Curated annotation (Swiss-Prot):
EC number: 2.7.1.71
Annotated PROSITE patterns: SHIKIMATE_KINASE (PS01128)
The protein's name in its UniProt record: Shikimate kinase
Record: residues binding ATP: G14, A15, G16, K17, S18, T19, R120, Q156
Residue ranges the record marks as coiled coil: none
Matches recorded under PANTHER family: SHIKIMATE KINASE (PTHR21087), SHIKIMATE KINASE 1, CHLOROPLASTIC (PTHR21087:SF16)
Record carries keyword Glycoprotein: no
InterPro entries: P-loop_NTPase (IPR027417), Shikimate/glucono_kinase (IPR031322), Shikimate_kinase/TSH1 (IPR000623), Shikimate_kinase_CS (IPR023000)
Listed GO CC annotations: cytosol
Length: 171
């Protein structure tokens, strides 16, 4: 890989963006960033707190700034938040500044992977499956719109998925 290209991971919560991203960055000797972790570092608070205090709109503003800043770097793997693609500006940033990989997963897998995770504010409801289905209806077409590569993450280890991404990208 002569030039340092950015790889941006998009997909729903529970698709494995952070875990796969760490493996991918390590395998390609790139820097790894997670937009949610970056927001937590910058605010000194967890995502749930940001949602509680600033609402989803405040969180999305912070997320847009973090992604704009990080996507300026060269040679990174960035795991984005599941809802980040709802912003046209973010979609444009990602498409223009790197390779976008959509990590696709089923609602069943999302439910299984997120059911005990209290750090996901949008899922702290009586019926998280319904929330995930509604989000998928809105977001999946946006993931597909900007994806250079689509990789299914169901029933595969993060390492195998990272290898599939490398293979598909020809690195």
């Amino acid at each position: 890989m002569a030039e340092k290209r950015n790889i941006f991971l998009v997909g729903p919560m529970g698709a494995g963006k952070s875990t796969i991203g760490r493996h991918l960055a390590q395998m390609l000797h790139l820097e790894f960033h997670d937009s949610d972790q970056e927001i937590e570092q910058r605010t000194g608070a967890d995502i749930a707190w940001v949602f509680d205090v600033e609402g989803e709109e405040g969180f999305r503003r912070r997320e847009a700034q973090v992604i704009a800043d990080l996507s300026e770097k060269q040679g990174i793997v960035l795991a984005t938040g599941g809802g980040s693609v709802q912003s046209k500006d973010i979609r444009n940033h990602l498409s223009a500044r790197g390779i976008v990989v959509y990590l696709e997963t089923t609602i069943d897998k999302q439910v299984a992977r997120t059911q005990r995770d209290k750090r996901r504010p949008l899922l702290q409801v009586d019926d998280p499956r319904e929330v995930l289905e509604n989000l998928a209806e809105i977001r999946n077409p946006l993931y597909e719109e900007i994806a250079d590569v689509i990789v299914k993450t169901d029933d595969q280890s993060a390492k195998i998925v990272a290898n599939q991404i490398i293979e598909q990208l020809g690195f």
